[in-house]
From Swiss-Prot:
<dbReference type="InterPro" id="IPR005797">
    <property type="entry name" value="Cyt_b/b6_N"/>
</dbReference>
<comment type="function">
    <text>Component of the ubiquinol-cytochrome c reductase complex (complex III or cytochrome b-c1 complex) that is part of the mitochondrial respiratory chain. The b-c1 complex mediates electron transfer from ubiquinol to cytochrome c. Contributes to the generation of a proton gradient across the mitochondrial membrane that is then used for ATP synthesis.</text>
</comment>
<keyword id="KW-0830">Ubiquinone</keyword>
<keyword id="KW-0999">Mitochondrion inner membrane</keyword>
<dbReference type="GO" id="GO:0006122">
    <property type="term" value="P:mitochondrial electron transport, ubiquinol to cytochrome c"/>
</dbReference>
<keyword id="KW-0408">Iron</keyword>
<keyword id="KW-0679">Respiratory chain</keyword>
<dbReference type="Pfam" id="PF00032">
    <property type="entry name" value="Cytochrom_B_C"/>
</dbReference>
<keyword id="KW-0812">Transmembrane</keyword>
<dbReference type="Pfam" id="PF00033">
    <property type="entry name" value="Cytochrome_B"/>
</dbReference>
<dbReference type="GO" id="GO:0045275">
    <property type="term" value="C:respiratory chain complex III"/>
</dbReference>
<dbReference type="InterPro" id="IPR036150">
    <property type="entry name" value="Cyt_b/b6_C_sf"/>
</dbReference>
<dbReference type="InterPro" id="IPR005798">
    <property type="entry name" value="Cyt_b/b6_C"/>
</dbReference>
<keyword id="KW-0349">Heme</keyword>
<keyword id="KW-0249">Electron transport</keyword>
<dbReference type="InterPro" id="IPR048260">
    <property type="entry name" value="Cytochrome_b_C_euk/bac"/>
</dbReference>
<dbReference type="GO" id="GO:0005743">
    <property type="term" value="C:mitochondrial inner membrane"/>
</dbReference>
Length: 380
């Protein structure tokens, strides 16, 4: 008789995903970030749930309710610090996960990849509306600036912005609906994650060589279940260290000042994980052009499978393409730095060059280099 985990309708699904799943024997630590993202999502949902129990989404009390959570609620300070810094770790894991996918050619699983890009957009939207909730200065002005970008949409732009605001400015209606969205989206993300995994398990995991690994599989449990647990421990220790020792390291001091529509902060900027996209937005001196560049800076990931020209899947044996990949990583870091700088010389020109290079690498350099490597190897 088959064991219960193989015959029970529900346990069978868990078994096929977590126990008896055939996994390539050579997947490295770069394959840990998927499970770490799952851990981040669970952590954020749980801490967020407890924060929502004490938070009030009204402009008169939102800021003070967050102060109340930190001062009067049992371990409220800890829950808030884990939630705020958990978002940073979420994005660190996302960017490393995407980088892994780009480096090893995982994007050739097109359905899995495209659902992943949709997940990235959902997480970015969730983080944006969440940042508005404490109703500090940067919350308010960040919401004003980013929602205003929609006014660049031809013909319907202004109507669209007022519709999202629920009035003629960022006000109580805006905060209330942003809280509703921030509560809803993580569950949408959880559902999309299930779809992401369904598509992944259709094909199985890629591996560092990019070659077919059917001849060398190992069961997920115990090998990768324990490897994932080690990753969990590392992530939780790092998150606890940041949340306990320097919880405000990545935050903006302006957000300790309650929102004031009459005083604009000297430098409006988003959280660090959006700075690269913000730099691309600012590098184009035209509103609609900037908005399109901002959008395309993320959606360009969907074009990567189409622009893949190499006969090899992974970059493991492609030194020229490796150089371009690390150039892209350096470029994103430069954009992140520029996004946090004031709009003045030399930061403007550095941002424009880095933004051009970002798109040039994706759209021209990487495809041409892939084709060139085929030629060099005589693989016409």
């Amino acid at each position: 008789m088959a064991s219960l985990r193989k015959s029970h309708p529900l346990l069978k699904i868990a078994n096929d995903a977590l126990v008896d799943l055939p996994a390539p024997s050579n997947i490295s630590v770069w394959w840990n970030f998927g499970s770490l993202l799952g851990l981040c999502l669970i952590t954020q949902i749980l801490t967020g749930l407890f924060l929502a129990m004490h938070y009030t989404s009204d402009i008169a009390t939102a800021f003070t309710s967050v102060a109340h959570i930190c001062r009067d609620v049992n371990y409220g300070w800890l829950i808030r610090n884990i939630h705020a810094n958990g978002a940073s770790f979420f994005f660190i894991c996302i960017y490393l996960h995407i980088g892994r996918g780009l480096y090893y050619g995982s994007f050739l699983y097109k359905e899995t990849w495209n659902v992943g890009v949709i997940l990235l957009l959902l997480v970015m939207m969730t983080a944006f509306v969440g940042y508005v909730l404490p109703w500090g200065q940067m919350s308010f002005w960040g919401a004003t600036v980013i929602t205003n970008l929609l006014s660049a949409v031809p013909y319907v732009g202004n109507t669209l912005v007022q519709w999202i605001w629920g009035g003629f400015s960022v006000d109580n209606a805006t905060l209330t609906r942003f809280f509703a969205f921030h509560f809803l989206f993580p569950f949408v993300i959880a559902a999309a994650t299930v779809i992401h995994l369904i598509f992944l398990h259709e094909t199985g995991s890629n591996n560092p060589t990019g070659l077919n690994s059917d001849s060398d599989k190992v069961p997920f449990h115990p090998y990768f279940s324990y490897k994932d647990l080690l990753g969990f421990a590392a992530l939780l220790i790092a998150l606890a260290a940041l949340a306990l020792f320097s919880p405000n390291l990545l935050g903006d001091p302006d957000n300790f000042t309650p929102a004031n529509p009459l005083v604009t902060p000297p430098h409006i900027k988003p959280e660090w994980y959006f700075l690269f996209a913000y730099a691309i937005l600012r590098s184009i001196p035209n509103k609609l052009g900037g908005v399109l560049a901002l959008l395309f800076s993320i959606l360009i990931l969907m074009l990567v499978p189409i622009l893949h020209t190499s006969k090899q899947r992974s970059l493991m044996f492609r030194p020229f393409s490796q150089f371009l990949f690390w150039s892209l990583v350096a470029d994103v870091m430069i954009l992140t730095w520029i996004g946090g700088m004031p709009v003045e010389h030399p930061f403007v020109i550095i941002g424009q060059v880095a933004s051009f290079l970002y798109f040039f690498l994706f759209l021209v350099m990487i495809p041409v280099t892939g084709w060139l490597e085929n030629k060099i190897l005589g693989w016409q």
